[in-house]
Amino acid sequence: MSDQLFIGIDSGTQGTKGVVFSRDDGRIQAEAYTDHQLIENIGGRREQKPEWWIDACSNVIGQLLNNSNVSRDMICAIGVSGQQHGMVPLDARGDVIRPAKLWCDTETAPQCDQITDHIGSPAKVIELIGNSVAAGFTASKILWLKQNEPQNYERLATVLLPHDYINFWLTGQRK
């Protein structure tokens, strides 16, 4: 068995999966998967608690190490990928303020319209930023937080995407 192994983690909307593979030959040593829950309602809300991702990552990493019969010191790197455009709001201490609004959350559609109207038109938005303002993206989620949960908005210091939050958990760095 290789002296150096990598762990790959993918935290998706429905679950977290992971692999341990050899640096030398790329051979997969072990695989693991854990489901995620989803908070949803008829109004388009789609949220998850970031601690669910951390619990899932811990579980998956534990399964990977157990199933591959390798020691932690053989792991030379962990790579993280995951769902995009979820808004993980953190306060100044790095604590999660509320559940993360996910990429598939459409509850923020009115805020998308407000941002577009403020800029002038859908065409002007595309001219300025190259995209329309979509409910799945982060800007409307921040405005939603300001308008619907002002007490939480006042605490907001950092916004991370889901995979960035997992990297923050692993490294302690908010990047």
Question: Could you tell me what each predicted segment is?
Answer:
Residues M1-R98, E127, R155:
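N-terminal glycine/serine-rich phosphate-binding loop of ATP-dependent small-molecule kinases
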Residues N59-K175:
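Glycine-rich phosphate-binding/catalytic subdomain of phosphoryl-transfer
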